[in-house]
Structure formats: C-alpha cells, structure tokens
Amino acid sequence: MQRPPPEDFSLKETKPHLGGGKVTGDKLTTTYDLVEQMQYLYVRVVKAKELPGKDLTGSCDPYVEVKLGNYRGTTRHFEKKSNPEWNQVFAFSKDRVQASYLEATVKDKDLVKDDLIGRVVFDLNEIPKRVPPDSPLAPQWYRLEDGKGQKVKGELMLAVWFGTQADEAFPEAWHSDAATVSGTDALANIRSKVYLSPKLWYLRVNVIEAQDLIPSDKGRYPEVFVKVIMGNQALRTRVSQSRSINPMWNEDLMFVVAEPFEEPLILSVEDRVAPNKDEVLGRCAVPLQYLDKRFDYRPVNSRWFNLEKHVIMEGGEKKEIKFASKIHMRICLEGGYHVLDESTHYSSDLRPTAKQLWKPNIGVLELGVLNATGLMPMKAKEGGRGTTDAYCVAKYGQKWIRTRTIIDSFTPRWNEQYTWEVFDPCTVVTVGVFDNCHLHGGDKNNGGGKDSRIGKVRIRLSTLEADRVYTHSYPLLVLHPSGVKKMGEIHLAVRFTCSSLLNMMYMYSMPLLPKMHYLHPLTVSQLDNLRHQATQIVSTRLTRAEPPLRKEVVEYMLDVGSHMWSMRRSKANFFRIMGVLSGIIAVGKWFEQICVWKNPITTVLIHILFIILVIYPELILPTIFLYLFLIGVWYYRWRPRHPPHMDTRLSHADSAHPDELDEEFDTFPTSRPSDIVRMRYDRLRSIAGRIQTVVGDLATQGERFQSLLSWRDPRATALFVLFCLIAAVILYITPFQVVAFAIGLYVLRHPRLRYKLPSVPLNFFRRLPARTDCML
C-alpha cells in the first residue's frame, strides 16, 4: 500500500494583484493597496413618499425588496406609514451577478400575500462607478412603476453605484454573500469590527497597620490578617506577627483593574479564631476613581480608613455598626508599569499604562487579509454536508480587528486592510482564523457553542524589512490529540513602514519594558498571577462588546494555557538548547582536531596566528570583531527573505507520541483515569530523576571549586595553596607573553607528545571533596 504524501507545512510566497496592480516588492501608496479589489453593486434605499394605501383602512405597511438575479435583500417594514425612511445599504458581489437588471420593489406587508405598491428597474450597464476618495453618490427620487411599466403613485429615493470594498458603506451593508443569514443578532455577528482592549492598571495596596480592633473573644490574642477583594481577585496578607488589637503588616498586594472602574476595592480585617473559621472584625470599601495615580516610585501619601461591621439583627436585617477601628494603607494606581496580558514571547505592546510616558511612534504596520484556501469543514449543515463560516481576528497593541464572516466557503475572500501604529519593532502581530458557530440560530441550537479554531499566524515586526510588501500564504496549523493537522492556508500582505530610521535604531538600545519593571521589579509569581487576571479582564470586557469578541477567541489569541506542562514542548525546548550549544560544541571539536594535528596545514596556520597574537596582543580584540564582521557580511547573501512561520519540526508536533499529546490536552486538574495518570506520573518521575542527576553533577563540580580553599581536604588545599604561591612568583618574574606562548604550545603540542591518560589538573580536581557525602 502506497503511503500518502506528507502534508505541505511550508510558507509560500505569492504574487497577487494588490490595489489593481502586481506587487514586485516596491512601495505602494494608494488606499487599500495591500488587498485585491473586489467589485460590488451598492444600493442605498433611503426613503419613500406618498405611497398609496393598500389596506381597507387606506394605509400601508411598506418595505423594499432589492432583487438582483437570485439574490434578494429586504429592508425592515413600517406599520401604517406612507412616508417611511429606511436608510439601508445592500451590497451585491459583482463576481456572482448573473442578471442584466436590478429591481427595487416596494411592497405592502400582509398576512397572506404581500401586495405590490411599485418598483424601479435599473439597467446594470447604466449604473455609474464610484471609488473613494470620491464623495458619496447623492440619492435621487424615482417614480414607481407597476408590473406593466406604467407610472403609479409614490416615489422611492435610491442611490445605486458600482464600488469596491473601500467604500464607506461596505462595513454596515447587507451582503449578498450572507443572504442565508437572518436575524439582527446573526447579521451583527458576521460584520467586520474594530475592538479596543480596556486600559489596564496595576493596583498596589500597601497594608500598613490597623488600630483599635474589637475581637469577639477578648481573652485571647487575635490572629489578624487582611483580605482584599477586587472584582474576581482576592488576596490576603500574612497573619500579623504582633498579636494584639493594633496589628502591623506593611505588606504589598497587587491587582489588575480596568477603566472604566466599575467595582470598589473591598478590604476585610479578619481574625482566625479556628483552623477553618475566620471572624470579620471590620470592612471598608474604597472607590477606585479617587485613588492617586503615580508614574514613578515617588512615595504615596498614606491614609486611615474607618472600618465598619455588618451585624445580622432579629428578622434577618443587616445593621451597619460604626466604631473606632481603623486601618492604615497606601493605595495607588501604578501607571509606570506595562500590564502584561500576553505571553512575554509574543508581546504586541510594551508601553506603560500612563499615556504621559509614551514615546512617539516609529512607524506604521499595515496588514491586508486577502483570502484563505483549502479550509477544512468545521461543522455539518442540515443534510450532513460539511461547511465553514470563517472569519479572521488580528491583534496588535490595544487594537483588535475582526473581519466579516464569509458564509459557507472553504475558500473565503476577505480583502480587508487594517493599520496600526508601531512603537517598538520587537513586537509581534497575531492573526487567527476561526469558524463562526453563532449563525443560523447557533446560540440556541448548539447550546451556545464555541467558535472553533482554524489556525494562527504570528509575524515579528523586527524580522521585516522596512517599506517592503510581504505577500505570503501561511499554513494554518492546529494541534489535536491525534496530532498536528493542516486546516488550510491564509494569504496575508504585510508592510512595516518606518517613519524614522534613526529612532528605530535607537529603540534597540532601550530596555524592552518600562523603567519601573527594572527599578522596582515584580516577582515571577506576581507577574504570573497578574497576567492571568489581566487576560480574564480583557476577555470579559471584549465578550461584553456588541457584537462580542468571544472568550475562546481572546484566550487563543493571548496564548492562555501555553505555560502548562507539555512533554512535546519540553523536548522542543531541549533540542533548541542543543541547537544553540551546537556552535560551541562544533568549535570545541574543531579545536580538538587542531590539537591532535588531524589537518597539519590548518594546525600550522593556527600556530602562526597564535604566535602573531602573542607577540602583538593588541590585535586580539580587533581580530575577533573583524572576524565577526566578515561572517555577518558573508551571511548577508543568504539572509532570510521571508517572515518566520510555525515550524512543525522545531515544535516536535510531527513526531509527538499520541499519549504525550493526550497528556498535553488534559484538563487541570486531570480528568484521565487513574491508571493513565499513574503511568504518566512514573514517566515524569523517570525524566525528573535524570534531570536531578544532571543538576547534582553540576552542583558537585561547583562544590569542588569551593573546596579548593576550604581546607575540607587539608592535603588538597595545601597543594593548591603551594601551587598558587609558586605560580605567583613565576608569573611575576616571567613576561606574560612568554607564559602565554608556553601555554599555547603545550595545548597545541603534537600527538606524539600526548598521553591518553587524564591530565594532572583534571586528576587533582576530580579528587576534591563535594557535599555529596552529606546528602541523605
């Protein structure tokens, strides 16, 4: 049986017609120049007047039906109105037009059969063309005709023109591609939108002390701590060491909050009266709107807050009791940090929260989402036929874009162009493709199903040449429990335009993150917790937009869960380390071959070079840097000409064991049977045992260095101290060049002068003691 050919996971360069012309890598300057032009027939139905009544009451319930071939679009209808206003736009794709005439019919809504009021017919050959930046076409009044072409009472105001996707009416228009979608919510879910991430702040709560607490049991020393609640986040201080009614903590707690501030900060002072029982001694609520905002580490004024206590009275009523207890705190919003909501490796924005600290932008990123090909069926329609309703989401900085959804197509064409301001070239733009599962009543029939992932592409801006248009077809890869799968390809056009080359070069000398991350850094555990909270806030806020950018989409774009354990990813990282060290290992092997005179000519040349450098040591550093310069110039001919893309071999996705993939997709905590968990635990113990051995060996070598002067082995330390004294005397009376010359000739000596036994220094080092004898 013949094996199927391997899937093509490579990146392909393309030559599309962008902006009406072929791209050759030169700079283009026209609007929508990174996408292919798509022709549409636009019909703007503005209003009607003096419509005749069709009912017994002499009134009408009018609506307009726009018909082009087999496509029909209808406006909303009005009840009992003879002068209705619609102001709706219909867009028909010119590629699918199979008619010669456009018909706009005004009808009267009825229970049995809608009555014809009148119509207007247009010959497609007579319709004008309009392309921005031309002004919008002015609508005109058209007299209605009956089915025989006779003029009837009533007029309809219309504007009809041929245009492209660059038209201002395009985003909000009804599209013939989505003629099968009905319902206001479903139509809103298929339109292109731009979203903005909420402005995130770090909230620092410095709990200093409390005074005059009133515990219920005055015969014991209270164990007091403070619980701080901010939305869904809750942190607590340690139990105060001063077990009294005036406890002290001086402890910092960090939270993530988003503008607009909707919830107050809740502080609760509690006494641990039993192992699983805490008693509330007082509470206070602090509105965030009135807190200080600081942009550096200048001290914030501390404040005393009164504590209140709610007591449940007879009848279940809550009574608020005010007493003299107070809590002393410093609370501020930190504007000098960048709130991390993305994976640190794929950050698209590194600016601080405070806009006052932002530097000017250094360029513009332009992205053209052209089309996708070969998409896989993501769901089944009625009758069992597979279908895909694909849309794209791109994120860079605080701006998210969502393209329109192309209904029932495995080769969707979007041809939408977007721009972002760039403040740092060492950032990443992420483009994801998803299947829209909220159409055709998807929210009801599918139980609110999630939008399925089709794939994702990341492009690092620093890998792009300035002012060059990159047009490539990227593979869309998704890792399943059964292995990596190609879901199709997405065709993108990308251009990074630099406004100031000098400013961009200067950025490479600046720290990646704002100053506060280095002057007063947060701990790793704090950053992990704050990143998790930030992603939750962003996904919640974007889910509340209209139409929503759903939680599963946001989390996939932000790489939530990428820090979880994965055997496949661990192997990939190990081989990445080996790839980095391979150059050093290759140099070591090359030097070893020189030392054993494997190639006598090369060894002689190295001897000559060594002697020159010993005689003229001032040439060492210039020689090294000149060598690196020549290597860089030599490699320029073979520099990468394409952006990097997902590499299945580097990720070990093409060779991962099914059980390893099943473990990677396991929930946390695990949901697998106990025997499988036991097997994986034993495997992890085996791997950890080998790592433990390697770490122990490294610790042993370090401890041997420490024992040289520790007198743990008195004879070894005595020998080393005596050797140091002799070496100091010899090096003092001998010129350095002579010493270096002697050491070099000894290292490069001929194999006939070598012994296969280990050297004396190595034998001495291996005999030194380590602390392994003290290990249990």
Curated annotation (Swiss-Prot):
- Enumerate the subcellular locations listed in this protein's record, separating them with semicolons: Endoplasmic reticulum membrane; Cytoplasm; Vesicle; Cell membrane
Q: In which tissues is it expressed?
A: Highly expressed in both vegetative and inflorescence shoot apical meristems (SAMs). Accumulates in root meristems. Observed in flowers.
Bilayer disposition of the protein:
Multi-pass membrane protein
Tell me if Transcription is a UniProt keyword of this record: no
Main location group = endoplasmic reticulum
Instruction: Drop me one GO molecular function for this one.
Output: glycosyltransferase activity
> What SMART domains does the database record attribute to this sequence?
C2
The entry's keywords: Calcium, Cell membrane, Cytoplasm, Endoplasmic reticulum, Endosome, Glycosyltransferase, Golgi apparatus, Membrane, Metal-binding, Repeat, Transferase, Transmembrane, Transmembrane helix
**What is its cofactor?**
Ca(2+)
Region annotation Disordered: where it falls in the sequence: 1-23
Q: Where does Ca(2+) 2 bind?
A: 55, 108, 110, 115
Q: Which Gene3D superfamilies match?
A: C2 domain (2.60.40.150)
UniProt-annotated binding residues for Ca(2+) 1: 55, 61, 108, 110
Tell me which GO cellular component terms the UniProt record holds: cytoplasm; cytosol; endoplasmic reticulum; endoplasmic reticulum membrane; endosome; endosome membrane; Golgi apparatus; Golgi membrane
Q: Phenotype when inactivated?
A: No visible phenotypes. Plants lacking both FTIP3 and FTIP4 have a dwarf and bushy phenotype due to an accelerated stem cell differentiation causing early termination of shoot apices associated with an increased STM localization to the plasma membrane, but compromises nuclear localization.
Pfam families under this entry? C2, PRT_C
Stretches of Basic and acidic residues bias are at 1-16
Residue span, C2 domain: 22-142, 181-305, 346-474
TM annotation in the entry: 577-597, 608-628, 719-739
Its BP terms in the Gene Ontology are: shoot apical meristem development
Claim: Membrane is one of the keywords in the record: yes
Q: How does it assemble?
A: Interacts with and regulates subcellular localization and trafficking of STM.
- Task performed by this protein: Required for proliferation and differentiation of shoot stem cells in the shoot apical meristem (SAM), thus determining the appropriate balance between the maintenance of shoot stem cells and their differentiation into other aboveground plant parts via the control of subcellular localization and intercellular trafficking of STM in the shoot apex. Prevents intracellular trafficking of STM to the plasma membrane in cells in the peripheral shoot meristem region thus facilitating STM recycling to the nucleus to maintain stem cells.
The Swiss-Prot or TrEMBL record describes its family as follows: Belongs to the MCTP family.
Per its record, how is this protein called by name? FT-interacting protein 4
Q: Which organism is it from?
A: Arabidopsis thaliana (Mouse-ear cress)
Gene name of the record: FTIP4
